A protein has these predicted regions:
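WD40/WD-repeat beta-propeller blade N-cap
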Residues: 87-100, 137-144, 180-186, 231-235, ...
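Loop/turn segments within WD40 beta-propeller blades
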Residues: 103-109, 148-154, 190-196, 256-269, ...
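Conserved beta-strand element within WD40/beta-propeller blades
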Residues: 112-116, 157-161, 199-201, 271-275, ...
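Intrinsically disordered, low-complexity acidic/Ser/Thr/Pro-rich linker and tail segments
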Residues: 2-102, 228-229, 236
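Short loop/turn segments that connect beta-strands within beta-propeller blades
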Residues: 126-129, 171-174, 212-215, 285-288, ...
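Short coil/turn segments within WD40 beta-propeller repeats
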Residues: 98-101, 118-122, 142-145, 163-167, ...
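Blade-level signature of beta-propeller repeat domains, shared across WD40, Kelch, NHL, RCC1
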Residues: 393-432
Length: 432
C-alpha cells in the first residue's frame, strides 16, 4: 500500500468570492466539532450523533457506542485474532451465480441485508449464520443493485433493481409495503437522516426524489433531551410518493445525505452527488441547485460515504483512489490507494470514524486481501485475507456500533469453490 500525497484539489464555489457558499449555509460544516488528530474519544458511550451544520445541532438516534475504542496501534493486534464468519445462501449454485451487489446494516446492527445479481434479497441475523434464520424477500424480477435500511426504523428496508422498481419492505412481516415504478434501471439510493426523503439514481442519470411520510411519535434522548419527532415503529399509515424527476447533464453515480436533521426553523437539506467527471456536487434539496463542487478525482467518482463523526467525506474513484475531504473547509487532506487496487465501487466507515475501507469488484484487485486504512494518518493498518487470490470485493459495510466488518467477494475464476457470499469479521462469536 502507498498513501499518495497529492496536492489537494481545488474546491469550486458557485459565484461567490467571499469564501462561503451561496444559499445561506455558511461553510456547510457537518461536524459538530473539529477533532484534532485521531480525536474521537468524545464518542465513547454516546447514544446519539450530533452531526450537523454548525448552525443546527440536532439529535440522530443510532446504535449504542462501544466504550472501548480501538486506536491505530491496537487495531492489527486485535483484528489479527478475530474470526471471519461465512453466511452461505442456498441460492448460490456455483461460482459467480450469486454475486452480492449491496450490503446494509439496520440502525441497531441486529440485522444485515444482502442484495444480489440473481434477484435474491435476504435479511440475515449476524449472530446466526445458518440460512434457516434468515428471511428471503421476493418480488424483484431483475438484479438487485442497492439495499438500504431506514435510518429511523430498524425493520424498514428499501431496495432498488434493474427491473425499474423501488420496493419498501417490512422485514418483520416479510412483506413489500410499497412498490414504485421509476421508469428505468435504478441502481443507487440514499436516505435523509430523518427518513423523510429518499433519492434514487437511475442509469440514465436521472435522480428521483421519493417522499416518505410516517406517523410521528416524540422521541426523547436517554439523557432527557427532547429530540425531533421521529417515525413511530407502528406499521401502517406510511406513504411513499415518487416526486418529479431531476435529469442530470452528466453521468451521475452514488449519492448521500449529510447526518443533518431538518427542523421547522431550518428545513433546508443538502445532498452529495458523484459524477463521471470526477466531481462531487453538493446540491440543495429539493431544488437540486449546485452550491459547491469538489474536483475530487481525475476520473469518475463512483462511491461516497460520510464519516459518522462528520469529520471526513470519503470518495471512491475509478482511478483506484479514495480521497478524504475535510468537511470543515472542503480540502482534500489525503488519498488512499492499494498496490493491487482497481475502481472503488464502495466505501464504508467504522462507527467511530477512525477506519475506512473500500470495495473493488474487479478480479484480482483485492490482491492479498481487503485493506483497512486509518483515516487520520492514511496508513494501511490491517489486511483481511479474502477467499481466493483473484477474488474481487463487491461490497463492504461496517457495523453501526461495533468493529464488525461485512463484505462479499466475487468469484475468483473457473473451477473455483468460492461462490462469493456474505462474510462478517467478528460476528457470531468471532471475537469482537
Amino acid at each position: 500500500m502507498e498513501t499518495a500525497d497529492l496536492s489537494p484539489p481545488e474546491a469550486t464555489r458557485e459565484n461567490d468570492d467571499s469564501g462561503s457558499m451561496r444559499g445561506g449555509v455558511a461553510t456547510l460544516n457537518i461536524a459538530s466539532h473539529t477533532p484534532e488528530a485521531d480525536d474521537t474519544e468524545s464518542l465513547s458511550g454516546a447514544s446519539t450523533r450530533t452531526l450537523v451544520s454548525s448552525e443546527l445541532p440536532t439529535l440522530v438516534p443510532m446504535a449504542p457506542m462501544r466504550p472501548d475504542l480501538l486506536h491505530k496501534e491496537q487495531f492489527a493486534l486485535v483484528f489479527g485474532g478475530v474470526k471471519t464468519q461465512s453466511y452461505s445462501d442456498p441460492a448460490a449454485k456455483g461460482p459467480g451465480s450469486h454475486t452480492i451487489r449491496s450490503l446494509a446494516w439496520n440502525p441497531t446492527g441486529q440485522l444485515i441485508a444482502t442484495g444480489s445479481a440473481d434477484r435474491t434479497l435476504r435479511i440475515w441475523n449476524p449472530d446466526r449464520p445458518n440460512f434457516r434464520y434468515s428471511t428471503d424477500l421476493r418480488g424483484h424480477t431483475g438484479a438487485i443493485e442497492k439495499v438500504l435500511f431506514s435510518p429511523v426504523r430498524d425493520a424498514e428496508l428499501a431496495s432498488c433493481s434493474a427491473d425499474g422498481t423501488v420496493r419498501f419492505w417490512d422485514v418483520r412481516s416479510k412483506t413489500c409495503v410499497s412498490r414504485l415504478d421509476v421508469g428505468g434501471e435504478a441502481f443507487t439510493m440514499s436516505w435523509s437522516a430523518d427518513g423523510s426523503t429518499m433519492v434514487v439514481g437511475k442509469k440514465d442519470d436521472t435522480l428521483i426524489p421519493i417522499s416518505v411520510k410516517y406517523p410521528s411519535a416524540p422521541t426523547t434522548h436517554p439523557d432527557g433531551i427532547k429530540a425531533l419527532n421521529l417515525p413511530s415503529s407502528t406499521p401502517g399509515a406510511t406513504t411513499y410518493t415518487a416526486l418529479d424527476p431531476h435529469p442530470q447533464s452528466v453521468q451521475t453515480n452514488a449519492t448521500t445525505f449529510p447526518w443533518c436533521m431538518p427542523t421547522p426553523e431550518h428545513p433546508e437539506q443538502h445532498i452529495f452527488v458523484t459524477t463521471g467527471e470526477g466531481k462531487v456536487k453538493i446540491m440543495e434539496y429539493p431544488s437540486f441547485d449546485v452550491v459547491h463542487t469538489l474536483n475530487a478525482h481525475t476520473s469518475a467518482c463512483l462511491s461516497i460515504a460520510l464519516a459518522p463523526t462528520g469529520r471526513y467525506l470519503a470518495v471512491g474513484g475509478s482511478d483506484a483512489l479514495i480521497s478524504l475531504w475535510d468537511t470543515t473547509d472542503w480540502i482534500c487532506r489525503r488519498t488512499l490507494s492499494s498496490e493491487n487496487g482497481g475502481a472503488i465501487r464502495g466505501v464504508s466507515w467504522s462507527f467511530d470514524g477512525r477506519f475506512v475501507v473500500g470495495a473493488c469488484d474487479e478480479l484480482g484487485c483485492s490482491g492479498n486481501g481487503l485493506e483497512i486504512f486509518h483515516a487520520e494518518s492514511g496508513d494501511s493498518i490491517y489486511t483481511i485475507p479474502t477467499a481466493g487470490h483473484n477474488a474481487g470485493v463487491s461490497a463492504v459495510a461496517w457495523h453501526p456500533s461495533r468493529y464488525w466488518l461485512a463484505y462479499s467477494t466475487t468469484t475468483d475464476g473457473p473451477g473455483s469453490s468460492n461462490s462469493g457470499g456474505l462474510k462478517i469479521v467478528g460476528a457470531a462469536g468471532g471475537g469482537l
